[in-house]
Each structure stands twice: as C-alpha cells, then as structure tokens.
Amino acid sequence: MNLLKPAVKPPSWLLAELTYRCPVQCPYWSNPLDFAKQEKELTTAQWIKVFEEAREMGAVQIGFSGGEPLVRKDLPELIRGARDLGFYTNLITSGIGLTEKKIDAFAQAGLDHIQISFQASDEELNAALAGNAKAFQQKLAMAKAVKAHGYPMVLNFVLHRHNIDQIDKIIDLSIELDADDVELATCQFYGWAQLNREGLLPTREQIARAEDVVHQYREKMAGTGNLANLLFVTPDYYEERPKGCMGGWGAIFLSVTPEGMALPCHSARQLPVEFPSVLENTLQEIWYDSFGFNKYRGFDWMPEPCRSCSEKEKDFGGCRCQAFMLTGNADNADPVCSKSEHHGMILAAREQANCTNIQINQLQFRNRANSQLIFKG
C-alpha cells in the first residue's frame, strides 16, 4: 500500500466493462451517451494484466459487463484468467447470444455466477423495451439453461413507469422459473436513463404500490424456499437523503471501460475530471495516486451543507455524478438531499412524473445511430 495514503484501502470489486457493443437497445442503460465514438477495446492480454494488478492489490470479485460481454469471443479466456488468479467471477448479461455450449465453456473456465436481465414479464413489452422481438424467449430459455447447469438462477428486472405496475407478474415469472435471487431495481438515472428520465421515472404512487406487492410476496414466500432473496431497489428521487454512492468515492469499487479508462464509478467519465488509463498507469498508481480517484475521497472536498452534516460519514455527500448532471457542478451537495439548495430540482421531477405521458416508442433508445446523433449534434 502507498504509505503516503495509509487510510486508503484497496478496491475489493472490479467491474470489467468489456465492450459497449450490445444486441439490445435499452433506453435506461448507464453507458455514456457518446459510446459510439468509443471504438477501441482492450485486448485479451491487456485485460489479463488489469486482472493481475487488481488481484495483487487485494480485489476479490470481478464482474464482466458491457454493453453485452457475450460479444467478446475471448470471454472464456478472460473468465479463466480471472478465476486462476482467485477472483470470484460474475457475468452480467442480457442473455442474448448465450447458448448452452457457451454456458458449458464458461463453467469449464471457472465462472461462478451468471445474472440474466429481463425488461418485462411478457414478450410484447420486453420486445418494445429491448428493441429485439426475439429477446424474451431467448432469455427464458437461457435462464432455464443456466439453472440446469448448476448455477443459481439470478434475475434482474430494471423497473420504471412502463413496467413497474406489472411487478406482481414479474415476481410470478421469477417463481415459475424457480429463481434463487431476484433484483427488482428501479432504474438509476445515469447515461441513457437520465436522457429519458421524464419518460421513465415512476410516480410516488407506483413506487408505494410496488413496495406493498413485494412485501406481500415476501410474506407469502417465507419458509417455502422460493425466492430466497427478493431485493427491491427504489429510486433515490423519492428520498430525502442521498445514497452513499459506491460506498464512497474510490473506497471499494473500481471500473475499467472498454478502452481502458479507470473510473471510481460507472458514470464518472461524464465529469469534468481527468481519469487515467490502464494503458498508461498501473492500477496501483491509479487507485492511490491519480487526481481523479483522490478528487472526492474522504470529506475535505465537501462544501456546506455537507461539510458540517452529521450524516456525511453515512452518505459521503451523495452522488457526484448526480450533482453534476442536475446542477452543473460535481462539488455541490446531491440534490436528492433535502438540505441541498438544489433540492427543488428533485421536487420538480417528482411533479413531472405525475403529469408526463411519454410512451415507450417516444423514448430515445440506446443504439449506435442515436449515440452518433447525440455527440455529433
């Protein structure tokens, strides 16, 4: 450990965003809006070097994400490399492009965990949100195949105003598939979700109803062995205090983008902060010594009202990316906090959710064509 910063612990979780390529077009994905101009991807050898450096520092878990990580032909090799180093390995996938042959290959490579995402509980809505008419049946087949290969079935449903009212059907589908773990995560408003926020943010009434449904199912499932873990994540737009984002800036989590930029969270590349590349620096140098990773560590950077707040060690001042997106200054208090001078922006978004009538086909979908239009415009 760098003796100049003895209080900084090493990262425990590495997210390898292998690619921005993806066969689905979810309008809520957290990838950057200008992903289409990010053409380069780290090679197999470069990724393995990243894994080696992260493991040497003490990281214990790695997530393979994207885009869709399945489009990388070297995925089995990357899994094997990470597993041989002692990582707990997790594949985060849409299931599109997954086959039983690939599941076999991943198992042989040592993959520990597979999470498959769904857009909805029925084929029509799933197709509308994914931009892929065949996605739903493929996801069903692969969820069953993952279970048949001895993996726990871990499902993720991203919730928003267009599908949250079918949360009971979503849970029923999870029970029908004999899922072990289900994450019902209301979309977090970064990247494409922030672009489409007006058309995605549920109303407070929708959130309350969904919470009641989840509570009823938890009571019903208690003791049955079904859905041992049913997690419901609500949007912080209906909270009065911000989330402790990533467990603190540069405290636990380290993400590497397809072209090798190292970030303290998924969305930080949008900030007016210079972040280093794994092609030019070691992870040790990046984690302990880089400007980007030290920018919002600890509490010294905080302005008021965060600096004197008794809750700062719990929420770390909230989300820097959200502060930047909403106020234009990442140093500001997260507007979710009722103590923030910008909290009115959150109140206005809640009110807007009660009035909007944006339909699914009016959302801006995450695809290369839309991305090119955005960054060229």
Curated annotation (Swiss-Prot):
A GO biological-process term: pyrroloquinoline quinone biosynthetic process
Any one GO molecular function term: oxidoreductase activity
PROSITE patterns according to UniProt: RADICAL_SAM (PS51918)
Domain spans labelled Radical SAM core: 8-224
Keyword terms: 4Fe-4S, Iron, Iron-sulfur, Metal-binding, Oxidoreductase, PQQ biosynthesis, S-adenosyl-L-methionine
Reaction(s) catalysed by this chain's protein: [PQQ precursor protein] + S-adenosyl-L-methionine = E-Y cross-linked-[PQQ precursor protein] + 5'-deoxyadenosine + L-methionine + H(+)
Cofactor remark: Binds 1 [4Fe-4S] cluster. The cluster is coordinated with 3 cysteines and an exchangeable S-adenosyl-L-methionine.
Pfam families: Radical_SAM, SPASM
Residues binding [4Fe-4S] cluster: 22, 26
Subunit (UniProt): Interacts with PqqD. The interaction is necessary for activity of PqqE.
Protein name, entry field: PqqA peptide cyclase
Organism expressing this protein natively: Rahnella aquatilis
